[in-house]
Amino acid sequence: MSLIVSPFAVIAASAAAVAGVLFLIYAALKSGHRDASLPPGPPTVPLFGNELQIPKADAHFQFMKWADEYGGTFSLKRFKNTTIVISDRKLIKELVDKKSNVYSHRPASLVSHLITHSDHLLVMQYGDTWRMLRKTVHQYFMEPNCEKEHWKVQEAEAKQMLYDFLTAPQDHMLHPKRYSNSITNSLVFGIRSKTVHDEYMERLFYLMEKWSLVQELGATPPVDDFWLLRVLPQWMTGHWRHRALEVENLMQSLYTTVLDQVRDRRARGINRDSFMDRVLDRLDKVPLTESQLRFLGGVLMEGGSDTSSSLILTIIQAMTKFPAVQARAHAEIDRVVGADRSPAWSDAAQLPYINCIIKEAHRWRPVSPLGVPHAVAQDDEINGMVLPKGATVVLNVWAMHHDPRRWPEPERFEPARFEEFPALAPTYAASGEWDKRDHYGYGAGRRICPGIHLAERNLIIGVAKLLWAFEFTQPVGSYSDIDPESGASQGFLHCPKEYGCGVRLRAPEKRDTIVREFQEAQEVFARFD
């Protein structure tokens, strides 16, 4: 039997094939194209858009150059994705703060989902679950609780930090990490980090390094915007899935272990009234899944440990490079506190220059130069430009903090810039006036860091005590790099690379004070034994 194919069928099949090819070509051209309604930006190429122009690390430097060229709001195309990069402080107030119901979402992220199962407060989508978890965190770390309860732990841990610097100055890169991690773990889990070699601390900072590298903008292929990247061999796409699953395993292991320790303690009848104790006490009223419990404790461990320690390390390094700043800080502290005690939180109002130093550290070396991306929940329009639903929104913190029109000589560490901002950061973040914001180190809008009150006190207490006790210098022949492009770690979180530092006790009589106060701190530490 012979088959006879109609000429019309051949023509129809050919036409369909041609149409299919033309559609694919059109889709490819459309994918990377920037619509005229979008904010301006660098020229695109078909299919890829601007993807090939975005650095795989430290993109904030290039983004600042583009901001100089295209303005405080520019757009990038990453295949079909639209990314809006904002360094216009007024616009951030108008959008992220005042339209928080539209700009509090996170971009869809397969990588984040693989790591956190969508249960991590930092990358969780905006909605009822996020609001419930955020409220739970806020209630424990709001300012009244910091003033009434948490400061005791902060003071005690800062006293140990002084003792650690006094007795082991060679570990200067580790002491601020132990300080911030122990405060966080004590308050969140009722578990101290007693030494710089604490297991949980070491595991946390190791996973944070991996997590930071995976989450950095440009470091992972845009697998959410071009499906083919999901199925290509891993060796062709930077092993993104393997890297994500490695972080997931590290997080699950650590956070499960710590939560299990809290439960074991409670099973023995010991309730330390930590954050996690209170959460477990209320599970009948606020039910959480096991995954939500693990990541709720985990996100607090991450945020509370990393930001404060990175900034303290930045400040110590700055003191070695800008001795006039350190001398002024010493003089201010000496006017308020003698050698018989170290500064306390109750002295903060009399130490305005210390507050300025902390603000300048946020500005000079922001821990997260591009923040955590937001997403647009619905089409929006600003200044005649369309910000489409689903677009990624990046707050260009680095550009705002290093704008020479706002901050002359931005690479100079000059705390006096902030003398017009005497209050703590939460005051200016809550201000309705965009030009009254001091810095963006804690984010913006409803996604602002929920531990902002605790973090401010960590920094003021820790830095004031350190500068009361010590003079920090750069030893002859040691290495200390403050170049922003080579002196900091890579990732979406930045910390100074290891640097040489001399630690000199400012007065012999302060040695006895440091030892005595460390002994007095044992009364607070006993609560966690």
Swiss-Prot record:
SUPFAM superfamilies in UniProt: Cytochrome P450 (SSF48264)
Q: What broad class describes the main subcellular location of this protein?
A: endoplasmic reticulum
- The UniProt record lists the EC number as 1.-.-.-
The cofactor named in the record is:
heme
Show the GO cellular component annotation of the record. Answer: endoplasmic reticulum membrane
Residue intervals passing through the bilayer: 8-28
Residues annotated as glycosylated are: 81
Question: Sorted alphabetically, which CDD domains does this protein's record hold?
Answer: CYP64-like
Keyword match Iron-sulfur: no
**Record keywords:** Endoplasmic reticulum, Glycoprotein, Heme, Iron, Membrane, Metal-binding, Monooxygenase, Oxidoreductase, Transmembrane, Transmembrane helix
- Report the InterPro entries cross-referenced here: Cyt_P450, Cyt_P450_E_grp-I, Cyt_P450_sf, Cytochrome_P450_fung
Q: Which domain of life is it from?
A: Eukaryota
This enzyme catalyses: 3-hydroxybenzyl alcohol + reduced [NADPH--hemoprotein reductase] + O2 = gentisyl alcohol + oxidized [NADPH--hemoprotein reductase] + H2O + H(+)
Function description: Cytochrome P450 monooxygenase; part of the gene cluster that mediates the biosynthesis of aculins. The pathway begins with the synthesis of 6-methylsalicylic acid by the polyketide synthase (PKS) acuA via condensation of acetate and malonate units. The 6-methylsalicylic acid decarboxylase acuB then catalyzes the decarboxylation of 6-methylsalicylic acid to yield m-cresol (also known as 3-methylphenol). These first reactions occur in the cytosol.
Please identify the protein, giving its name as recorded. Answer: Cytochrome P450 monooxygenase acuD
Q: Which organism is it from?
A: Aspergillus aculeatus (strain ATCC 16872 / CBS 172.66 / WB 5094)
